């Protein structure tokens, strides 16, 4: 919830997601909390549909985000390359899970950093934020939305199963421009 709350505090307007563990908690939070004038939340049928939807939203000027896990992130490669080439701001959250291929959806692992830094063909290096605590998740959620807007391109936000499922009290966040 901290990551989602941070992104919302930064003005997130458009969230599209496919339910894939352990990223589903972000989709559920957004469905329950991202409401208001000009805001949109939708569950789609695939990760490819999700990346293309936020590409369109980013192209239209909306602060947009999706979340997935390792196998879904692999499917977003072409869309991330297009976002980089066309300078379309968007955020993709990769909630890492253990194992290769489809992986182990209920196990934790921190293994996607290299994939997130180089998600598409060509000489592309994406900015990646990797928070380590619940409090850092809040600020990383906000920073990722702001960086995508500032630098006009995709930003990857890494999390992992244990962090995504953890609940704890944090200091009241300081909100400013």
Kindly give the residue locations of the regions a language model identified.
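Short, charged low-complexity intrinsically disordered segments located at boundaries
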Residues: 60-62, 144, 171-177
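C-terminal structured domain segments across diverse proteins
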Residues: 103-106, 138, 169
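Active-site/ligand-binding-proximal alpha/beta "capping" segment
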Residues: 123-148
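Short, solvent-exposed polar/charged micro-motifs at secondary-structure junctions
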Residues: 52-53, 139, 166-168
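A structural signal for short coil/turn segments at secondary-structure junctions
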Residues: 87, 151-152
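Thiamine diphosphate
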Residues: 1-126, 130-131
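Short intrinsically disordered, low-complexity coil segments enriched in acidic
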Residues: 1-7, 149, 155, 177
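Conformationally flexible catalytic loops at phosphate/diphosphate-handling active centers
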Residues: 152-177
């Amino acid at each position: 919830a901290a990551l989602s709350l941070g992104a919302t505090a930064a003005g997130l307007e458009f969230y599209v997601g496919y339910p894939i563990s352990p990223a589903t908690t972000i989709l559920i939070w957004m469905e329950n909390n991202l409401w208001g004038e000009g805001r949109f939340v939708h569950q789609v049928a695939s990760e490819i549909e999700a990346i293309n939807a936020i590409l369109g939203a980013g192209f239209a000027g909306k602060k947009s985000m999706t979340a997935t896990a390792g196998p879904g992130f692999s499917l977003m490669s072409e869309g991330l390359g297009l976002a980089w080439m066309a300078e379309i701001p968007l955020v993709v959250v990769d909630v890492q899970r253990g194992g290769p291929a489809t992986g182990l959806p209920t196990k934790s692992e921190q293994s996607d950093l290299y994939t997130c830094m180089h998600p598409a063909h060509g000489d592309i290096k994406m900015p990646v934020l990797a928070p380590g605590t619940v409090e850092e998740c809040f600020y990383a959620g906000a920073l990722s939305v702001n960086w995508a807007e500032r630098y006009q391109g995709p930003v990857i936000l890494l999390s992992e199963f244990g962090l995504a499922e953890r609940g704890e009290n944090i200091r009241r966040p300081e909100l400013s421009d």
